[in-house]
Amino acid sequence: MSVTLHTNLGDLKIEVFCESVPKTAENFLALCASNYYDGSPFHRLIPGFMVQTGQPANPSPPENPKGGRSIWGGNFEDEIRPALRHNERGVVSMANKGPGTNGSQFFLVFDKAPHLDGLNTVFGKTIGDESLRTLAKLEAVEVDKKNRPKEKVVIERVTIHANPLAE
């Protein structure tokens, strides 16, 4: 199962680990299918570490808070799996503010990040050479002192490939 995030810097194809983390996969795929991520900015970028996205493009609290929400309306529990680790470039993981605070935001690592193992739910990884090129372009974006990209970088749209949740 995979999705392609079409960004203004190129495509990121992500293999989603549906069987290992079913609730996280369901949330991510449903948000993708509902166009939730269309226009979502890459709002935090730390070269050598990660890039974060997944907040709504047009937040309007309380239904769609700036920090994002899950398909269930609030946060949901972690699905930490010892076999799923932040062990290579392109691993995709849920962003959170502590245990059980997953919503819609996620990040992609630029390198190994073992200090995140056990803290953030890994739910996918980038696949293909084009994804690696796009990650390199993302990592090269200049940032300000608060790790915000100085240029606009967004998810323009998402393509779902063989969605097992489709009815």
Describe the residue ranges of each PLM region:
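Cyclophilin-like peptidyl-prolyl cis-trans isomerases
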Residues: 1-167
